C-alpha cells in the first residue's frame, strides 16, 4: 500500500530564472476540470432567464443565489454584498474539488497548495481592509501593542490566519483520503485471509471491498467535503468582517 501526493503529468521547460520549469500536476488538471464543469453549469443555469413562468432550472439557480445571499448577509451584514461572488466561487470550487474524487480523479483539496492559494487570497483581502479601516500607520502601530516586544508574536498572529485556514481544510480532506485508503487495504487483506484458501478464482474474491468503501467515500467526499467548504467560507466572511471593523 502506498500513499502518494499529486503526480507531475507534464513539464513545460521555460528556463525562467528562479521560477524554473512549469509543471502540470494532477492537482492542476483536476482543478481545471472542476472550473470548466462549474463554468458550464453556471452558463446552463443562467441561460434564458425570465420574470414570469420560470423554469425549474431557473428556480434552482435562484434558490442557490438566494441561499448564498442569505449566508453572506447573516455572517457579514447587508453592506458586504460585493463579497457574494467571492464566497460563492470558493464554496463551489471547494465542493467541486472534493467531489471530483468520486469519479476517480485526484482531489485538488488533498494538495495543500490549493487551500494555501485560497487562504492567501482571503489574507490579502483581510490585510487590505485592516489597513483601509485603521490606516497604515495605525496598523503598524497595532503590531507593537501592548509593548514593542510583542511585535513578533503579533506578526505571527496575523500570519496564522491563512495558515490555520489552509491546514484545517487540507487536514480534514487528507485525513478522509487516508482513512478510506487504509480501510480499502484492510478489507482487501481480510478478503485474502478468509477466501485465500479457496481453489481457483474463488481465492481472488474481494467481497469485503464491495459496499463498505462506498459508504465511507460517501461520508468523506460528500458530507465531509461540504462541511469543510462551509467552514472555510464561514471563516472567510467572519475574518473579513472583523478586518473591516464590523462586529
Short names for language-model regions:
Residues 1-247:
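Selective transmembrane helix interface/packing segments
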Amino acid at each position: 500500500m502506498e500513499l502518494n501526493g499529486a503526480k507531475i503529468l507534464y513539464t513545460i521547460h521555460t528556463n525562467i530564472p528562479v521560477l524554473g520549469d512549469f509543471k502540470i500536476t494532477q492537482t492542476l488538471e483536476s482543478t481545471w476540470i472542476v472550473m470548466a464543469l462549474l463554468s458550464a453549469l453556471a452558463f446552463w443555469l443562467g441561460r434564458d432567464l425570465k420574470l414570469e413562468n420560470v423554469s425549474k432550472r431557473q428556480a434552482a439557480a435562484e434558490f442557490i443565489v438566494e441561499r448564498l445571499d442569505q449566508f453572506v448577509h447573516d455572517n457579514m451584514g447587508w453592506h458586504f454584498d460585493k463579497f457574494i461572488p467571492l464566497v460563492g466561487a470558493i464554496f463551489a470550487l471547494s465542493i467541486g474539488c472534493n467531489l471530483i474524487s468520486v469519479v476517480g480523479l485526484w482531489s485538488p483539496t488533498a494538495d495543500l497548495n490549493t487551500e494555501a492559494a485560497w487562504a492567501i487570497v482571503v489574507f490579502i483581502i483581510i490585510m487590505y481592509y485592516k489597513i483601509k479601516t485603521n490606516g497604515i500607520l495605525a496598523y503598524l502601530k497595532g503590531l507593537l501593542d501592548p509593548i514593542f516586544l510583542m511585535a513578533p508574536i503579533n506578526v505571527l498572529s496575523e500570519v496564522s490566519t491563512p495558515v490555520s485556514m489552509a491546514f484545517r481544510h487540507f487536514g480534514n480532506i487528507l485525513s478522509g483520503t487516508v482513512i478510506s485508503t487504509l480501510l480499502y487495504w484492510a478489507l482487501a487483506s481480510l478478503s485474502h485471509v478468509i477466501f485465500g484458501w479457496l481453489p481457483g478464482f474463488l481465492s481472488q474474491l474481494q467481497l469485503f471491498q464491495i459496499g463498505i468503501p462506498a459508504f465511507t467515500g460517501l461520508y468523506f467526499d460528500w458530507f465531509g467535503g461540504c462541511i469543510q467548504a462551509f467552514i472555510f467560507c464561514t471563516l472567510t466572511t467572519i475574518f473579513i468582517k472583523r478586518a473591516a471593523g464590523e462586529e
